[in-house]
Amino acid sequence: MLPLLEEETRLEQLCGLEAMAQIAASLKPFHPDRVVAYARSEVTISNDTVTAEGAAFRSHRRWYGLTFTCDLTDDRQAVRSFAFSVGKAIPKRLWEQYSLPDPMLDTD
């Protein structure tokens, strides 16, 4: 499915999947089920690097701040390296402002 998306969206999704996998593997209390790379600020893509300074991820029906740098292979089909930092829980009153779906209403 990822090859059918626009290039920028595909790269964000590829890095978002990597973020969920790495968070789940290294931070056992979290079980991420969604990432919004552009939640609190625009994503930047430069050459083969995707940087999301204002991303968010959802775990256990709560949203948390996330920043990541995702370096892609030369063909941009896979992740070469990935670094991330998890932030604080995002208050529910800010979810709509950041386009973060309420887990109770999310149909995706």
What do these predicted regions represent?
Residues 1-108:
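Mitochondrial intermembrane space
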